[in-house]
Amino acid sequence: PGVFISASAIGYYGSFEQCSDTSELDESGPEGRDFLAKICIDWEKAALPAADLGVRLVLLRTGIVFSTKGGMLQKMIAPFSFFLGGPVGSGRQCLSWIHLDDEINCIIDILDDSRYSGAVNAVAPLPATMNDFARELGKVMGRPSLVPVPKLAVQLLMGEGAEYAVKGQRDIPGALKRNGFGFRYPVLA
């Protein structure tokens, strides 16, 4: 093939308790050291032989994908429907996200444009905090964002994976911006 896209995640950079714990990270940001970062790093290393064969390799580091058809957004909608919505954890963690339509268009651009090579962060240009996200979701649904989901509740529901629900990344789409990608959904609103 002319191009190989290896689907990775922004977990590559590690997870942080709150947005102020890190600066914005583009594709040149350092590797993280937590478990999820190690998985992403190993996953990306496994794809590197494709480049040695002369194939254009893109390591697509995707953030939280928003869609009403599934995933995090759908899980957050249910509590808000019953006036029980609010931020997960402290609410101060960063949420580097992308709308499903932008994710699809990003992949199409990568397939069609040879300027994309190496790491590409598939995230919207403006990371938000979990508090911002919950407030915006409440506004869209006409519901208050009052009831935070405590870390303990997340741990009971998710077990070991809870750490990644109450922490976040502050990533930006450096490669997409450089190549003029047009986001349909650049901000939460």
Regions found by a protein language model. Give the residues of each.
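Conserved Rossmann-fold NAD(P)-dependent oxidoreductase catalytic core, especially the SDR/UDP-sugar
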Residues: 1-34
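Glycine/proline-rich active-site loop of Rossmann-fold NAD(P)-dependent oxidoreductases
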Residues: 17, 53-55, 66-75, 110-120
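Active-site Tyr-X1-5-Lys
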Residues: 30-60
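Glycine-rich "substrate-gating" loop/helix at the edge of Rossmann-like oxidoreductase active sites
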Residues: 32-36, 63-70, 90-100
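Alpha-helical substrate-binding/gating segment
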Residues: 77-85, 93-127
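Mid/C-terminal beta-alpha module of Rossmann-like enzyme folds, strongest
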Residues: 110-160
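C-terminal amphipathic/interface module of NAD(P)-dependent oxidoreductases
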Residues: 163-189
